[in-house]
């Protein structure tokens, strides 16, 4: 209710919320796909004394988790966009039939959006931590940083991580919007017994 009042109230506020949701889902879809593609295609081969060593994102399990989470985020957002645009909006707003089915769908979307935000943020945090170790090393354990040796690999991984951070922020905003869409169904403005 407070968000609707802040947006101007009435039908105009409803339209703004729907536009914001579609925009966030489209942004998350694009950024998730871009982050997954940047990290998944990241490889670099170096030759050391006639031995070829290849750095790949699969060498760090946190990066594999990030690729998986970003790809799932992109796919889920694409499915939600299709349902939102083709299904008339009942999937997200919960107002499709005015009753229990709409609320059940809203709870499902809310739960999935929350889970997606948590998983994507966990993947980003793990990948950032692994990247710091890759960049700086861990002197206490005598681990050296590898970014001096695999510069192109680290730059592309950094671009993928930056994209994933923005995708994670979009997922958090989408989770907030999903919570708003759900809990406004239980608002005090004219609930029927």
Curated annotation (Swiss-Prot):
InterPro entries: CASP/CASPL, CASP_dom. Residues 40-61, 135-156 are extracellular. It is a multi-pass membrane protein. The keyword Nucleotide-binding does not apply. The chain crosses the membrane at residues 19-39, 62-82, 114-134, 157-177. Homodimer and heterodimers. PANTHER family: CASP-LIKE PROTEIN 2B1, CASP-LIKE PROTEIN 4A4. This is CASP-like protein 2U1. It comes from Sorghum bicolor. The lineage of its organism: Eukaryota, Viridiplantae, Streptophyta, Embryophyta, Tracheophyta.
């Amino acid at each position: 209710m407070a968000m609707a009042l802040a947006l101007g109230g009435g039908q105009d506020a409803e339209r703004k919320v729907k536009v914001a949701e579609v925009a966030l889902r489209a942004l998350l879809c694009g950024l998730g796909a871009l982050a997954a593609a940047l990290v998944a295609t990241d490889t670099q081969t170096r030759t050391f004394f006639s031995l070829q060593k290849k750095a790949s994102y699969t060498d760090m399990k946190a990066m594999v988790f990030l690729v998986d989470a970003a790809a799932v985020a992109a796919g889920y957002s694409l499915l939600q966009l299709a349902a939102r645009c083709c299904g008339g909006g009942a999937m997200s707003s919960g107002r499709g039939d005015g009753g229990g089915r709409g609320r059940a769908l809203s709870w499902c979307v809310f739960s999935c959006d929350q889970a997606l935000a948590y998983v994507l943020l966990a993947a980003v945090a793990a990948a950032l931590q692994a990247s710091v170790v890759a960049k700086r090393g861990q002197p206490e354990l005598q681990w050296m940083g590898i970014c001096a040796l695999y510069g192109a690999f680290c730059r592309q991984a950094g671009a993928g991580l930056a994209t994933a951070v923005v995708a994670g922020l979009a997922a958090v905003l989408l989770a907030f919007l999903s919570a708003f869409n759900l809990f406004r169904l239980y608002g005090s403005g004219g609930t029927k017994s």
